[in-house]
UniProtKB/Swiss-Prot annotation:
Protein name, entry field: Probable GTP-binding protein EngB
Keyword Cytoplasm: no
Function: Necessary for normal cell division and for the maintenance of normal septation.
Gene: engB
Boundaries of every EngB-type G domain copy: 27-201
Transmembrane segments: none
Domain of life: Bacteria
Organism taxonomic ancestry: Bacteria, Pseudomonadati, Pseudomonadota, Gammaproteobacteria, Enterobacterales
Essential cofactor(s): Mg(2+)
Organism: Yersinia pestis bv. Antiqua (strain Angola)
Length: 216
């Protein structure tokens, strides 16, 4: 497989949807970003794409209530899933979000990778583990980003990385763990490399259409 380097700075917003029934057709390739409401998911997307306002950041956790799609190039999409685990959201809303998350992860055939973001100081909460379990159950590879790595000293950061890497062994899945910081740009290259690898598995017919378009 040839790994293609994508220009994530060209990423643009496509649509917001309450559930998978309102998403575009299940084709091409998608990589989803999931995480607790305060895990730094929007900041990570903005850092990845070098666009400050691509994914909305908020001082109020739980603002991402919809599935937000962003297109890198034709047929290649990043998906910002609803943040989970925010205590002040009504229980009915929490359950609705969790249903939407589970349905997307288990039924969206074009999903080729899942990025789960967790605060490095508080990793692998119950809902984080649920995301991993859903992904592993359908054979979706996972990249765990331990965010806000700048909050810890180097030694403590490495210790947390090792702890999480050991803790995920029982999941028996294709799971990679990396430290990440939007502020200090830690782990951004690792994220891009993983996305490039996943997106290079794009169906040949989509890739052919894309290159035909470039030649016009």
């Amino acid at each position: 497989m040839t790994i293609r380097n994508y220009n994530y700075h060209m990423t643009h917003f496509v649509i917001s949807a309450p559930d998978i029934r309102h998403l575009p057709r299940d084709e091409g390739i998608e990589v989803a970003f999931a995480g607790r409401s305060n895990a730094g998911k929007s900041s990570a997307l903005n850092t990845l794409t070098n666009q400050k306002g691509l994914a909305r950041t908020s001082k109020t956790p739980g603002r991402t209530q919809l599935i937000n799609l962003f297109e890198v190039v034709d047929g290649v999409r990043l998906v910002d899933l609803p943040g989970y685990g925010y205590a002040e959201v009504p229980e009915e809303m929490k359950l609705k979000w969790q249903r939407a998350l589970g349905e997307y992860l288990q039924k969206r055939n074009c999903l080729k990778g899942l990025v789960v973001l967790m605060d490095i100081r508080h990793p692998l909460k119950d809902l984080d583990q649920q995301m991993i379990t859903w992904a592993v159950a359908v054979g979706t590879p996972v990249l765990l980003l331990l965010t806000k790595a700048d909050k810890l000293a180097s030694g403590a950061c490495k210790a947390q990385l090792n702890l999480v890497r050991e803790a995920i062994i029982p999941f028996m899945g294709d799971i990679q763990v990396e430290a990440f910081s939007s502020l200090k740009k830690i782990g951004v290259d690792k994220l891009r490399e993983k996305l490039d690898t996943w997106f290079s598995e794009i169906p040949p017919e989509v890739m052919a259409e894309e290159f035909d378009g470039e030649g016009e």
